[in-house]
């Protein structure tokens, strides 16, 4: 089993897709990359903690290759916009990848190279060593499954799920 910690805008979006990905055993929404210990959602949203909203995706690489997890990540958000995803603006929404080993760092850099071929603008994804990971509050875990009819889910997450189904259907469970 491997765990990648990835930030691509609001963590609810990545969580929704990875929850439906074959071989993924756990998706935990959280915060990392900042300077405040044990931040909460409101502190992170204030933009003063330096943290990014991220998901820790644990998966069986014999079922779903690392490259698929990473390529999905780059397909599901815009890695060329600095500190924003659509209407979500702030450093907490930055495109980011947090590694724990040199091997992961290399995998992340290779994924950026693959993704750059798909984008005309330069990719600005931050690649950093994982500092402390802070699990987000329970309401943010598996958010889409809890609140599928909430406005954000309908307008923002549903199109990302549709895109994942279009390009990664072989890797999705439903």
UniProtKB/Swiss-Prot annotation:
InterPro entries linked: Met_Sox_Rdtase_MsrA_dom, Met_Sox_Rdtase_MsrA_sf
Oxidoreductase among keywords: yes
GO molecular function, one term: L-methionine:thioredoxin-disulfide S-oxidoreductase activity
Keywords recorded for this protein, A-Z: Oxidoreductase
Active-site positions on this chain: 10
Gene3D superfamilies given in the database record: Peptide methionine sulphoxide reductase MsrA (3.30.1060.10)
The protein's enzyme class: oxidoreductase
GO BP of this protein: protein modification process
Keyword Oxidoreductase: yes
EC number: 1.8.4.11
Pfam family, one: PMSR
Catalytic reaction equation(s): L-methionyl-[protein] + [thioredoxin]-disulfide + H2O = L-methionyl-(S)-S-oxide-[protein] + [thioredoxin]-dithiol; [thioredoxin]-disulfide + L-methionine + H2O = L-methionine (S)-S-oxide + [thioredoxin]-dithiol
Family: Belongs to the MsrA Met sulfoxide reductase family.
Functional note: Has an important function as a repair enzyme for proteins that have been inactivated by oxidation. Catalyzes the reversible oxidation-reduction of methionine sulfoxide in proteins to methionine.
Protein name: Peptide methionine sulfoxide reductase MsrA
Gene: msrA
